[in-house]
A protein has these predicted regions:
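Nucleic acid-binding interface residues in structured DNA/RNA-binding domains
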Residues: 1-110
Length: 110
């Protein structure tokens, strides 16, 4: 497995239940500032059955990012709602209330 993707998956795994993080926050927490798109690529490549809470990652506007397969957006929203994450009428999560949940791992000196 790509070591960069492993760092991303480890950062996503640190997002607590009922909280979200943006692609950019995950990138920074993985020691990859400015590489939000790489987080998207890594999550798209997540092996089936790998216990990484991919559904807790949203875009910088607090929205579920569009996907080639729309049903995954529906699944993501349902998973977040089951964890107590609320969406407004525009389909956004309040990042002030539910965001900022991922931190950089200790010992990462990059």
């Amino acid at each position: 497995m790509d070591p960069t993707y492993e760092r991303i998956y480890a950062a996503v795994a640190r997002i607590p239940r009922g909280r979200v993080a943006t692609y950019g926050e995950v990138a920074a927490a993985a020691g990859l500032p400015g590489r939000a798109r790489q987080v998207g690529y890594a999550l798209h490549s997540l092996p089936a059955g790998r216990p990484v809470p991919w559904h807790r990652v949203v875009n910088a506007r607090g929205e579920i990012s569009p996907r080639a397969e729309p049903r995954f957006g529906t699944i993501q929203r349902k998973l977040l709602e089951r964890e107590g994450v609320a969406f407004d009428a525009s389909g956004r999560v309040s990042l002030a209330r539910f965001g900022g949940a991922v931190r950089r791992a200790k010992g990462r000196g990059r």
